[in-house]
């Protein structure tokens, strides 16, 4: 369900954008075949205000935005905390970060690789032989990072909303995926899915003898002082300040209604998408990651390298976690995330002149297309 939304986002962006620390040029990025790019201009405050004005509306109930980088900074918010009290949206509110979680997972795995605890060339079967049948070829750990493992999606609840308070163990999700057998040989094709990162989270736990959540906390959140960021486990609530999330849902007669989906058990998302964070924390993370402060140079290069795939298949657009795109004539690394009621993005230009973090309380966060408010934010920030 998530892949079409992310694919639509990529298409939309390709065709189209106080006092934060600056981000240096990325330590490594794939060759783009273009001349040296001009740095981003100062953030266009007027365009950014226009992008988020008029909330709540049919597309979103709130938006929180942070623009940074060497070219300057801008911060803004719009909308309401909830549709009952209609008080102003909390600009420091926490939200469900969805698949942005994957970049934290990748950072943890790559730190372990730098320490020699995890070998990216070693098959996953070496570490967790009990999971895989003989029908699976050796799956390099690297292929979990860059979405080329060949694993099929795992199964979830048929009626997700009806089961929003129920717990689905990630191991059950993985078992359902592996029962389907491989889709293709590892490394042959790239398919954006959660399953690789769910397995990667379990692998992190296997090699460390620790929980994935604790590893992320001690390696990423605590060193960067990301005090708003945590993993909720089976708790359906968002702790601390947050704005409510709403989702359009279809009635039996075909009409739609807005439903408050703030409370939702994310246990099945695990290392692929269960994180809760804030725009301030994700901006800190974005600066540190792409500024080379979280990973050694070799491991950051690994994250920012597009894999070579089999002849005749579409070229890769994801590295070891983030997606590589050209937006507004500039090379950008980014990652989106979406859970019902919440959509977000982190992005950085390769030259470090612009970073963007947003959270949009989108009423179509799991839809097939890009939310109009999010699209306007990207257009204003990265053009």
What are the roles of these predicted feature ranges?
Residues 52, 71, 102-105, 109, ...:
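Residue-level preference for non-acidic, small/hydrophobic
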Residues 135-332:
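Short, surface-exposed loop or secondary-structure junction motifs
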Residues 44, 48, 97, 101, ...:
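Hydrophobic (often cysteine-bearing) scaffold residues that line and stabilize catalytic clefts
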């Amino acid at each position: 369900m998530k892949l079409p939304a992310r694919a639509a986002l990529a298409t939309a962006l390709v065709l189209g954008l106080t006092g934060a620390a600056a981000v240096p040029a990325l330590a490594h990025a794939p060759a783009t075949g273009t001349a040296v790019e001009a740095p981003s201009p100062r953030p266009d405050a007027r365009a950014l205000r226009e992008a988020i004005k008029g909330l709540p509306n049919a597309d979103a109930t709130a938006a929180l935005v942070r623009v940074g980088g060497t070219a300057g900074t801008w911060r803004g918010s719009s909308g309401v905390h909830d549709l009952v009290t209609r008080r102003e949206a909390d600009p420091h509110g926490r939200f469900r970060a969805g698949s942005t979680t994957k970049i934290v997972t990748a950072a943890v795995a790559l730190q372990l690789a730098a320490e020699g605890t995890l070998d990216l060339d070693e098959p996953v079967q070496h570490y967790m032989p009990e999971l895989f049948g003989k029908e699976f070829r050796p799956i390099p750990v690297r292929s979990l990072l860059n979405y080329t493992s060949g694993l099929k999606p795992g199964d979830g609840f048929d009626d997700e909303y009806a089961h929003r308070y129920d717990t689905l163990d990630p191991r059950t999700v993985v078992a359902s995926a592996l029962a389907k057998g491989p889709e293709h040989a590892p490394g042959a094709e790239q398919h954006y899915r959660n399953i690789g990162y769910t397995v990667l989270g379990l692998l992190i736990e296997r090699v460390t003898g620790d929980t994935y959540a604790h590893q992320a906390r001690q390696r990423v959140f605590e060193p960067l002082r990301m005090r708003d960021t945590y993993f909720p486990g089976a708790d359906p609530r968002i702790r601390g300040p947050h704005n409510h999330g709403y989702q359009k849902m279809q009635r039996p007669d075909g009409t739609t209604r807005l439903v408050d989906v703030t409370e939702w058990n994310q246990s099945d998302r695990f290392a692929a998408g269960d994180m809760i964070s804030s725009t301030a924390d994700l901006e800190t993370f974005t600066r540190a990651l792409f500024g080379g402060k979280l990973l050694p140079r070799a491991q950051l290069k690994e994250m920012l390298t597009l894999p070579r795939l089999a002849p005749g298949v579409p070229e890769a657009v994801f590295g070891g976690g983030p997606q590589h795109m050209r937006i507004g004539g500039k090379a950008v690394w980014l990652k989106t995330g979406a859970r019902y009621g919440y959509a977000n993005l982190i992005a950085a230009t390769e030259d470090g002149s612009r970073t963007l973090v947003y959270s949009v309380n989108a009423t179509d966060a799991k839809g097939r297309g890009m939310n109009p408010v999010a699209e306007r934010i990207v257009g204003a920030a990265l053009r």
